[in-house]
Design a protein with these regions (language model features):
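Single conserved hydrophobic/aromatic residue that forms the stacking wall/gate
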Residues: 1-7, 11
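N-terminal auxiliary interaction/assembly segments of multi-subunit proteins
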Residues: 12-21
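Ordered, amphipathic secondary-structure segments that act as subunit-interaction surfaces
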Residues: 20-42
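Non-catalytic, interaction-prone regions of core transcription and DNA-replication machinery
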Residues: 29, 36, 51-52, 67, ...
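Intrinsic, low-complexity N-terminal interaction/targeting segments
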Residues: 38-97
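Short, highly charged C-terminal tails/helix-capping segments
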Residues: 47-49, 108-112, 135-145
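Mixed-charge, glycine-accented linear interaction segment located at domain edges/termini
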Residues: 64, 78-135
Length: 145
């Protein structure tokens, strides 16, 4: 399973770059596997949060990998987390999940901006995987990879 592959990768890769990258790829693969043929899902999702920070995440689970990124951080680290890895996490997730993701965020507090991005992403995923009436594949092609 994807989880077992991830566990083996993390045993070998001890630095944060590879651990975050591998985790995101496998998480994306798990979502893709769990959705199967994607029959009946909403396919799209988006959200906007929090405090002085704002994040917008647009998601399409249509089977093509793409990340559009419009967020910058004023700090290099939040605690022990390298902020540059935020974008890389989402690029890796897109690769594993075969999804389109557009992220736009701004704010003064780097911690709040990153938190807003992850919360918006979670809400977007919840919207996109929600079952809709009709149970059809949400594509004019009749299938999604």
């Amino acid at each position: 399973t994807a989880y077992r592959r991830q566990r083996q990768m993390c045993i070998r890769d001890r630095d944060e770059h590879h651990t975050i990258e591998d985790t995101a790829i496998v998480l994306g693969q798990c979502f893709s596997e769990a959705l199967g043929g994607k029959k009946g899902i909403g396919r799209y999702g988006f959200a906007l949060p929090m405090d002085e920070a704002r994040a917008e995440v647009l998601l399409d689970l249509g089977g093509r990998s793409w990340l559009e990124w419009n967020a910058a951080f004023s700090r290099e680290y939040v605690g022990d987390f390298p902020t540059e890895m935020t974008k890389h996490f989402f690029a890796s997730f897109c690769q594993g999940a075969k999804c389109n993701l557009h992220v736009a965020a701004k704010g003064e507090n780097t911690h709040h901006v990153i938190e807003a991005i992850f919360k918006a992403f979670a809400r977007s995923l919840r919207m996109a995987v929600r079952q809709e009436a009709g149970g059809r594949i949400p594509s004019t092609k009749g299938r999604m990879d």
